[in-house]
């Protein structure tokens, strides 16, 4: 298969090693490593054995009571939420190399990270069987999707024509082939109004009418769990009818939600403080826009505040969320604070590993991520109905109820 993962890449990913760490382990040059990586040279002998042993040592031991796949995985926010209720990830797809590094550092796996999802939607048998599909696919207008006049002859033929060329199409292809018991899709709130509402309408039509799933959606804000105003839409689908009612799920009140001070580090490197030049520029830029009646501008937050939405552009100047420093210029959030703001770690919990990539890349990754406690909430909300759905399935998964019955 074009673009298929080589043995070298698969094993060093399974072992949780970067390219450089892998070639140091097997004691070969970079040029030899690149040949292994591209498939031009065959990995064999002692080098193969060393990587196999390293990969075997890192295989996750917990089987999980259901199997899920993680598409457009980013740095694993959806995964963390569904591992929380006892799921086991059996396949990951993420094209960005830096996100792959962060993901690999934080998830000990016995499977590699697939790159371009199109090779898997074209050959869905490459994806293992699973009960749940998770996907945070990018938002794209279907009005721009390429439709072949020769094939359509002026008529629509379901999602193959309506969504061709978009990443939702690849997701739909995989759902259509594997028919998982359930799926959870995540996107920005504006998906509902994107392209005049056409995008969301088409997605729901494809999922309900073309794929035959029972689908509901809901926008949930992150404020009850983290000190950030971040709204995201979650689309939940079950293959068979259930009593799940997304609109009836009780979301905690944001009134008693955490404040910014709860996630701030005590000792912060001065490099995160804005330069005098940048701070003056941002202040002048804000005044200019306010005079013109625009709302754009930098925002400074104190320890008792809840921030705006962290975006992937945060690395540029940090203007959307600046931390007040009495007696000094404000500062950016640190990457560690971004991890906490997105719920990837708790202050006294297990640290989220932030190595091998630059601050710029980490800001982008967290700005594109989901808020983990929100995903945990969604996962816990559908868990009883997922157990119900899987009780009729005849795979190797054992639900918590079955596990208890079996002693």
Where are these regions (language model features)?
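A short, Lys/Arg-rich alpha-helix, primarily the initiator
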Residues: 1-15
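Short, charged amphipathic recognition helices of the HTH superfamily
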Residues: 14-24
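C-terminal target-recognition/interaction regions appended to catalytic cores
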Residues: 21-22, 29-32, 277-407
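Recognition helix of helix-turn-helix/homeodomain-like DNA-binding domains
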Residues: 27-42
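Core alpha/beta nucleotide-donor-binding catalytic domains of modification enzymes
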Residues: 56-179, 189-193, 198
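Class I S-adenosyl-L-methionine
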Residues: 123-130, 142-309, 313-315
């Amino acid at each position: 298969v074009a673009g298929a993962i080589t043995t070298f890449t698969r094993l060093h990913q399974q072992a949780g090693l970067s390219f450089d760490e892998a070639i140091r382990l097997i004691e070969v040059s970079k040029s030899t490593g690149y040949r292994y990586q591209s498939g031009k040279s065959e990995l064999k002998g002692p080098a193969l054995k060393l990587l196999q042993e390293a990969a075997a040592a890192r295989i996750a031991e917990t089987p999980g009571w259901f199997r899920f796949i993680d598409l457009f995985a980013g740095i694993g926010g959806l995964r963390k939420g569904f591992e929380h209720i006892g799921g086991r990830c059996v396949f990951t797809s993420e094209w960005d190399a830096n996100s792959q590094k962060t993901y690999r550092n934080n998830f000990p796996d016995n499977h590699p990270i697939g790159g371009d999802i199109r090779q898997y939607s074209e050959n869905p048998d490459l994806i293992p069987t699973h009960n749940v599909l998770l996907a945070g696919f990018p938002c794209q207008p279907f009005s721009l999707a390429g439709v072949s006049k020769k094939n359509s002859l002026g008529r629509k033929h379901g999602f193959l024509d309506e969504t061709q060329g978009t990443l939702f199409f690849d997701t739909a292809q995989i759902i259509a082939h594997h028919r998982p018991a359930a799926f959870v899709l995540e996107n920005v709130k504006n998906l509902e109004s994107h392209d005049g509402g056409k995008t969301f309408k088409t997605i729901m039509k494809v999922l309900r009418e073309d794929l035959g799933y029972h689908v509901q959606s809901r926008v949930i804000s992150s404020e009850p769990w983290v000190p950030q105003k971040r709204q995201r839409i979650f689309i939940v689908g079950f293959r068979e009818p259930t009593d799940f009612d997304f609109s009836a799920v009780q979301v905690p009140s944001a009134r008693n939600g955490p404040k910014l001070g709860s996630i701030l580090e005590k000792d912060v490197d001065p490099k995160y403080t804005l330069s005098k030049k940048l701070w003056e520029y941002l202040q002048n830029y804000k005044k200019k826009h306010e005079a013109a009646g625009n709302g754009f501008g930098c925002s400074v937050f104190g320890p008792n505040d809840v921030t705006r939405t962290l975006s992937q552009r945060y690395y540029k100047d940090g203007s959307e969320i600046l931390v007040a420093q009495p007696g000094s210029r404000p500062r950016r959030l640190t990457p560690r604070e971004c991890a906490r703001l997105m719920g990837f770690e708790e202050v006294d919990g297990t640290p989220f590993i932030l190595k091998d990539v630059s601050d710029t890349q980490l800001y982008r990754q967290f700005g594109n991520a989901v808020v983990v406690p929100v995903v945990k909430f969604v996962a816990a909300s559908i868990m009883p109905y997922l157990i119900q759905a899987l009780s009729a399935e005849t795979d190797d998964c054992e639900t918590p109820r079955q596990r208890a019955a079996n002693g």
